[in-house]
Each structure stands twice: as C-alpha cells, then as structure tokens.
Amino acid sequence: MKISFTGTGCSGKSTLLKKCKDYYGDRFDYVNEVTRPIARKGLPINEDGGDETQRAIIDAHIENNKLDNVIMDRCIVDGYIYTQWLFEKQKVNEETYSYAYSTFNDIIDDLDIIFYCCPLDMEDDGERSINESFQKDIANNMSL
C-alpha cells in the first residue's frame, strides 16, 4: 500500500503525516521529506529551483516508489507540478520537464491513495517558500 499527501507548501501534509505515525505506528514506513534534504545539500528549492534540483527531486520520488506499505509527505504529483511551474517560468529546460512528465506517467498508478491538502495561511518556518503568489500558482496547477 502506497499512500501520499500532496499539496502546496503550508497545506498540512507534515502535520497529517505525524498524525498517521502517531496512530499507525510501525504498521507503515514513512517518508517525511523529499525537498528539504535536497535543500540541505545546497540546492535551491521552490520557486528558486532549477534543473539539478528538480532532477534530484524526481529521482527521490523514483526511489520512494520502490517502497511498499508507506505513507509519504509528498509524491510524484508534487514533483511534476513544481517542475511544470518552473518550466513555464523558464527555470528548467525541456529535458527536465520531460523527465518529470514521463516519470509522473510511469509511476502515478503505483500510488494507491493520494490525499490532496488544500493550501492554508502561509507560515514561515525558515525553509518553505512564503510567496503567496507561488503557492496560489501551484495550487491552481494541482487542481487542473
């Protein structure tokens, strides 16, 4: 069973994952983060991301897809939607966009349940983007 939360930054995904951990305990494995470990390696994230960042994120989603009986904070939906936004802003090239798109199509059906989390009021935690326009763009792309 593969379950994931998806949504913009500041939409409650991490809070819901923590609630799942508290409730289900060791009945599932958990993927807490995808993007922040990449940021800790020095790559820019969110609206500042580029080809290297998005490829690393898509690669992480491919690795997470190999897990079974897992609940994840994000999934390939997020990787694709953020890459799509960056492509529209000419921050990633067509090759990176195509990689995200083909990976999305290759692994999306492996997910059993995807919960979409609606955006909440922005809260600065020191890492997430607090750009409300960016959040709205991502939310709009996710609802298409």
Label for each model-derived stretch:
Residues 18-63:
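Conserved substrate/cofactor phosphate-moiety recognition/catalytic segment
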Residues 87-142:
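A glycine- and Lys/Arg-enriched "phosphate-lid" helix/loop adjacent to the NTP-binding pocket
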Residues 33, 73-76, 115-121:
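Short loop/turn segments at strand-loop or loop-helix junctions that form parts
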Residues 52-109:
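Glycine-rich phosphate-binding loop used to anchor ATP phosphates in small-molecule kinases
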Residues 2:
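Walker A (P-loop) ATP-phosphate-binding motif of ABC ATPase nucleotide-binding domains
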Residues 5:
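Hydrophobic anchor at the beta1->P-loop junction of P-loop NTPases
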Residues 9:
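The conserved Walker
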Residues 13:
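Conserved lysine of the Walker
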